[in-house]
């Protein structure tokens, strides 16, 4: 059984621990809407702001010609997302961002409003409640609505479906979020240069049911728990939650040593080899003939420097369990199993 959102092959022992009928679990997993954890827990994913905006945009276009009460839109991972339309009138539709098991998702339940009119070609505009980028260096140019490239592609694809279904030449859609400006003040948007609302985000179309814990709260979070996983990035974050559901998972990036300084109790360091092993031995590639740790792993998986770097990571970990995973979530090295 494979999770289609992250392509993770769910171990049979995890499936057995859920206690759910296999057919029911397979159906839920195939939809992309649930995540299975190593203790058998099944958590509910939600849809991103990008998926919700796509649904509102498509529904608004369809409502130009007919009454709409639900809509299906594409997602970046190839799955279809199915959302209810809470309100519709000619050229206008409202879709609510569905609830999920991510307790800190402050955008849950927000209303997204799409307003459409016929036009030449496809045009997507940001309305009230969608932030505006006020600085250079972000994925979206300065002065533009804070709709990241991937969700913008998703919205345009959804509008294109509606235009083709109705036989129109095109449509202009304005997306707004009535409570977006208020909610935006509770996010980090102002610090990164986005003002006036929230950002429309989402690389997969689905919201994972856990927190990234980005920013200055990380140290406090690590201090306040006695069972913590320090992970290096979003891939590590995703699989750490699945592998170690009883732990608080905190993304520390390359600041593993800093995270360790905050931590006490039962500590796990989990992440991709490029960060974990190079943290163990920053000079492991010098004179090796390999450009990256991944290249060394692929071409010489028994290379002595891999073992040395792992042993050095274990030593630097001062008793922490060190777990190295690949991009599919498979465990490559584990100090617990090797001790």
From Swiss-Prot:
Keyword field: Cobalamin biosynthesis, Methyltransferase, S-adenosyl-L-methionine, Transferase
Annotated GO MF terms: cobalt-precorrin-5B C1-methyltransferase activity
Superkingdom field: Archaea
SUPFAM superfamilies documented for this protein: CbiD-like (SSF111342)
Biological or metabolic pathway of the protein: Cofactor biosynthesis; adenosylcobalamin biosynthesis; cob(II)yrinate a,c-diamide from sirohydrochlorin (anaerobic route): step 6/10
Pfam families, alphabetized: CbiD (PF01888)
GO biological process: anaerobic cobalamin biosynthetic process; methylation
The enzyme's E.C. designation: 2.1.1.195
Catalytic activity reported: Co-precorrin-5B + S-adenosyl-L-methionine = Co-precorrin-6A + S-adenosyl-L-homocysteine
Protein family membership: Belongs to the CbiD family.
Protein name as annotated: Cobalt-precorrin-5B C(1)-methyltransferase
The organism of origin for this protein: Methanosarcina mazei (strain ATCC BAA-159 / DSM 3647 / Goe1 / Go1 / JCM 11833 / OCM 88) (Methanosarcina frisia)
Gene name in the database record: cbiD
């Amino acid at each position: 059984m494979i999770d289609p959102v992250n392509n993770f092959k769910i171990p049979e022992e995890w499936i057995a621990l859920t206690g759910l009928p296999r057919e029911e679990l397979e159906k839920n997993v195939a939809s992309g809407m649930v995540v299975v954890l190593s203790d058998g827990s099944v958590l509910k994913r939600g849809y991103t702001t990008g998926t919700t905006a796509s649904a509102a945009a498509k529904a608004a276009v369809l409502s130009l010609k007919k009454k709409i009460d639900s809509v299906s839109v594409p997602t970046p991972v190839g799955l279809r997302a199915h959302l209810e339309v809470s309100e519709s009138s000619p050229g206008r539709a409202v879709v609510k961002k569905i609830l999920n098991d991510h307790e800190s998702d402050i955008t849950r339940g927000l209303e997204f409003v799409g307003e459409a009119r016929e036009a030449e070609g496809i045009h997507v505009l940001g309305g009230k409640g969608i932030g505006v980028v006020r600085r250079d260096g972000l994925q979206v140019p300065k002065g533009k609505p804070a709709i990241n490239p991937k969700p913008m592609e998703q919205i345009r694809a959804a509008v294109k479906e509606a235009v083709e279904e109705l036989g129109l030449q095109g449509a202009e859609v304005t997306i707004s979020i009535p409570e977006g400006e208020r909610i935006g003040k509770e996010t980090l948007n102002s610090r990164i240069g986005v003002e006036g609302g929230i950002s429309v985000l989402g690389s997969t179309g689905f919201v994972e049911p856990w927190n990234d814990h980005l920013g200055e709260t990380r140290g406090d979070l690590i201090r306040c728990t006695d069972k913590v996983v320090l992970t290096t990035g979003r891939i590590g974050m995703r699989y750490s939650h699945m592998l170690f559901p009883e732990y608080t998972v905190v993304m520390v990036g390359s600041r593993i040593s800093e995270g360790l300084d905050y931590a006490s109790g039962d500590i796990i360091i989990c992440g991709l080899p490029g960060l974990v092993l190079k943290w163990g031995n920053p000079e492991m590639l010098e004179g090796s003939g390999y450009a990256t740790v991944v290249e060394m792993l692929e071409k010489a998986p028994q290379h002595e420097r891999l073992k040395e770097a792992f042993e050095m990571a274990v030593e630097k970990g001062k008793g922490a369990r060190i777990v190295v995973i690949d991009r599919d979530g498979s465990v490559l090295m584990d100090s617990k199993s090797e001790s």
